[in-house]
Amino acid sequence: MRFSLFVHMERVSDQQTQKQLYDEMIELCQIADRGGMHAVWTGEHHAMNFTIAPNPFLNLVDLANKTKNVRLGTGTVVAPFWHPIKLAGEAAMTDIITNGRLDIGIARGAYSFEYERMVPGMDAWSAGQRLREMIPAIKNLWKGDYEHNGEFWQFPKTTSAPQPLQQPHPPIWVAARDPNSHEFAVQNGCNVQVTPLHLGDEEVEKLMGHFNAACEKFSDVPRPEIMLLRHTYVADSEEDAQLAADEINTFYNYFGAWFKNEREIKQGLIAPLSPEEIAAHPFYTPEAMRKNNVIGQAQEVIDRLKAYEAMGYNEYSFWIDTGMSFERKKASLERMINEVMPVFA
């Protein structure tokens, strides 16, 4: 099982400058590159300081000039926010500039806050339908001379300009959860990205079950790869692990508040949650975070990751967005590289 870093600029306070957050994100990616991680993933979000990521291709092009070896992945572009011709062209240009280091992760999106601003009236179902129309379209645009008459997009015969360096195209990954999304990915020759979010390892097993069932159903298609994304913290003591569980619990409370889309947003920042609100959450608790997420000293983390490797996961992505200080993120990532990854070499 190989390892990657999943990272964004995350701004939780107006005291943090966006330039500093960008520089810190780049430094974490450079640590991952020097440390032998396989890839860096960064995604797309709009008008949210919680996850500042208006166009992942911009970040990846910059990273290509500041790293040497890591694959550079979109984790993920949000299909309904793109036109197929624009996505095919920007992805192909990124592949050329990065000298063939691009992986493309694509998702339907998750936040109604973004949907109502980017595609008013769209719900999660129709976002998923756009994803299913998008992937065959961009593949055909890269082949060239492709005419499209779909439900959401129509255009006459077109060839992506440019076409990607990697042939027939960069690896495509689909963010999947339910059985249908796994089946769509496998049937279309795409790799799969999954995350249990805050849930425990029974969810990790369930997601692998969906993937295996899809591979069995479409056994005529070469088996794609599957990546597991989890919030991870490699601690230097149990006290440090407990602090991380508290911090990740706070992160998930804010994640949930953005997801519900009911709280006031001012200057791109959501209204702060009080300690009482965080403590009253029905299922986000520090105890659940400590148990479910990959939080612990090196040996505990190794044991968890060995179990995921045995399940059949090809890649484990270290989700570092946690609301922690840069110093704590950096220390955890360095312990991951120095104390955990060598066991899997």
Give the ranges of each region predicted by the language model.
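Hydrophobic faces of well-ordered beta-strands that scaffold small-molecule active sites
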Residues: 3-7, 40-42, 72-74, 102-106, ...
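Active-site mouth loops of central-metabolism enzymes
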Residues: 7-22, 77-84, 166-176, 232-235, ...
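Alpha-helix-loop-beta-strand connector modules within alpha/beta enzyme cores
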Residues: 53-74, 130, 134, 333-345
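An alpha-helical appendage that flanks or caps ligand/catalytic pockets
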Residues: 5, 124-161, 202-313
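N-terminal beta1-alpha1-beta2 module of alpha/beta enzyme domains
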Residues: 1-72, 167-170
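Conserved, mostly hydrophobic/aromatic
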Residues: 3, 36, 44, 63, ...
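Flexible, glycine-rich active-site loops centered on histidine and acidic residues
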Residues: 2-20, 80-148, 191-193, 198-202, ...
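Acidic (Asp/Glu)-rich catalytic clusters
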Residues: 33-34, 60-68, 91, 95-102, ...
